[in-house]
């Protein structure tokens, strides 16, 4: 059982290293998928009937 625990730990560390995006210390690109200021989902809440903001 200890073998599987050690194996899982090592595979987890390897996964974290491989899955890490970009270079260490590089700034995060929040606009990678487009302009973050765009509305998500379509209709703004203030245009939906019955919702008062």
UniProtKB/Swiss-Prot annotation:
Molecular function as annotated in GO: serine-type endopeptidase inhibitor activity
Localization: Secreted
Summary of the function given for this chain in its UniProt record: Potent and specific inhibitor of human thrombin. It is also a potent inhibitor of thrombin-induced platelet aggregation. It is capable of antagonizing host hemostasis and facilitating blood feeding.
Naturally occurring in which organism (per UniProt): Glossina morsitans morsitans (Savannah tsetse fly)
Keyword Cytoplasm: no
Endpoints of the signal sequence: 1-21
Designated name of the protein: Tsetse thrombin inhibitor
Keywords, sorted A to Z: Protease inhibitor, Secreted, Serine protease inhibitor, Signal
Gene: TTI
CC terms in the record's Gene Ontology section: extracellular region
Tissue: Expressed at high levels in salivary glands and midguts of adult tsetse flies.
Source domain of life: Eukaryota
